[in-house]
Every structure is written in structure tokens, then in C-alpha cells.
Amino acid sequence: SLRNAAKDCLKIKETNPSAIEFVDKSTLKNFDFKFKKNTDCLLFVEYDSDIEKNKNNLKNFADGQIAKISKSRKEIEKWWKFRDLALSYSLKSIKQEDRIPHIIEDATVPLEKLGNLFSIIEKLNKKFHTNTVMYGHAGNGNIHVRIISNRKKIKILDEISKTYFEQIIELGGTITGEHGDGIARSRFIKNQYGPTNYQLFKKIKEFFDPEEILNPGKITKPRRFSTLEKV
């Protein structure tokens, strides 16, 4: 399960891997490998040394099963290409009419809270009758989430994003780990950094850009995410 995979990530991290990456089951059908039918997700774990030792460690403590051990450069590159194409695969798996804006795109939590992040997504899907595609950098708790829902239900994004970000912040996480805030997430910046820091951001912006020329409508003077009205 996703939560068991999150627990495994904590143990794997202690073995000093060079990478721990994650994709959920929605992308597995795109790879030329026969996964077991009950596979919920896949962790890509890479080591630079002590391969046999770490392989045995994983067998001893991992809840999931080792699907494949790759040592040749060609085969390793094949698996990493699959991971790198997760975004493309995720889009292919979503029907055009079920593609809605990605506001809760790449939140990040402390690794020990990764299971909580998956639980939050599970509850939101149940409450709003949505589905999700997830992939990301499990080793540092950074998970990319794409909501699947009919565009006619786009207004639910407001409540989903508000609930999700509030709970991510409560876990000690950040609403975006890689992609920045932009128009989509700027209205949540004050919640992330607090009123004192937010006022400081505004003063810095007013000092260097009093005419609002650079990136207007972002971070300190957020405007409503226009896609919500137009899609």
C-alpha cells in the first residue's frame, strides 16, 4: 500500500541510497514489465555502493517486494527513463475532459509524515469523488499530485486546495517543494509563512517593484486563479 511504502522510505533512507523515487500504479501499465496485479506503487531505489548488502537489507525490512534488481548501465537507464516519463504517462492516463488545473501540484512534507500525505489525498478523493495520479521524490517527501475530475466540477478545487494546504502546513510541510507558487498558490503564501513574514515580503516587493511590473498578481498581491472561472 502507499502508506506501507511511505514507512519503507524511512527505513530505506537509513541505508544511504543515492535516490528514492516513487510512482503510483496509474503509470505502471506504460512500462514493459509484468508487475503483480495488486501493486499499488513502485519505489525506485538507487545505490552507488554496497549493492549486495543493501539488497539484503531491503529484503529483510521492506514491506513490499523487490520487483527488479538492475546492475547494467543500459537497464538502469531504461528504468530511470520510465520514472522520468511519469509526467507524460500521468497525462496520457487522464481523459481530456477530466484534466483540471494542478493547484496542489508538488507539496512536500518531512519524510516521517509521508504516509499522512497519502492519507490526506485518500480522504479528499473519497469526499469529493475524485481520483489522483501521484509520482515524485519520495526520498525527500516531495510528491506531485494530479487531480482527476470532470471539468464541470472544477469549483471543488477551491475547497480541495484549501483543505490540502492547511493539513500539509500542519504536518510541518510546504505547499510547494519544486515548482514555485505563481498565480495558482500565491493566495496560500500567507498561511505558509505567517503574517509577519508575509508583511515583510510585501515591503520588499513595494521597495523594489512599486509599479508592479515584475510578475504582477503573484506572492504578495495574489489574484484569484483565473482558470477557475474560465475552464
Segments predicted by a language model, with ranges:
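Noncatalytic alpha-helical scaffold of FAD-dependent oxidoreductases
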Residues: 1-231
